């Protein structure tokens, strides 16, 4: 909670708005839209991969949430406050972070499959910003975000490694 309290102490309305917007890039609809666009415009196989990653990641994430049942930071510590605009979407359990897992799976998958360096760097920037936004907004702990990042990272590596072996 120390990191969350440190971030709480430096919040400003400007950064609240920025990270409230950035965090939406970790929603399920983003991986679905990205998968459809990639399917139509780039590669059917890559589109299928992205859709598979998103759906499998969502199932794994919800399973872990129900298994561990860890409450949100402000539930654990009533003195802690979150950015209010984030409260409406921060429902259910805290661990692991669904937004982080979606962002790493989606943008990590795109980064792993693209040949364009600028696309790769943009994807890495987005997945890092979404992950940080969950901490800044106060809706997840570093453990929630770190485990989600690792789970999605492993999924990206396994899926794209299995393809290389084919």
What spans do the regions from the language model cover?
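Short conserved micro-motifs on helix faces and helix-strand junctions that flank
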Residues: 40, 66, 95-96, 135, ...
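Hydrophobic transmembrane alpha-helices
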Residues: 108-112, 152-159
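Conserved small/polar residues in nucleotide/adenosyl-binding loops
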Residues: 160-166
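Interfacial helix-loop-helix junctions of multi-pass membrane proteins
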Residues: 73-76, 129-153
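Alpha-helical and His/Cys-centered functional microenvironments
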Residues: 103, 138, 165
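Hydrophobic alpha-helical bundle signature of multipass membrane enzymes
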Residues: 1-94, 100-130
């Amino acid at each position: 909670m120390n990191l969350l309290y440190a971030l709480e102490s430096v919040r400003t309305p400007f950064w609240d708005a920025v990270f409230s917007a950035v965090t939406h890039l970790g929603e399920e609809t983003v991986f679905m839209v990205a998968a459809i666009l990639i399917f139509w415009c780039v590669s059917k196989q890559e589109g299928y991969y992205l859709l598979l990653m998103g759906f499998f990641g969502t199932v794994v994430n919800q399973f872990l949430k129900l298994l561990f049942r860890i409450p949100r930071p402000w539930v654990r510590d009533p003195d802690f406050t979150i950015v209010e605009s984030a409260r409406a979407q921060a429902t259910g359990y805290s661990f692991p972070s669904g937004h982080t897992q979606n962002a790493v799976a989606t943008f990590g998958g795109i980064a792993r499959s693209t040949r364009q360096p600028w696309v790769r760097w943009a994807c890495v920037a987005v997945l890092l910003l979404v992950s940080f936004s969950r901490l800044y907004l106060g809706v997840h702990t570093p453990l929630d975000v770190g485990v989600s990042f690792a789970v999605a990272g492993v999924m990206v590596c396994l899926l794209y490694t299995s393809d290389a072996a084919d």
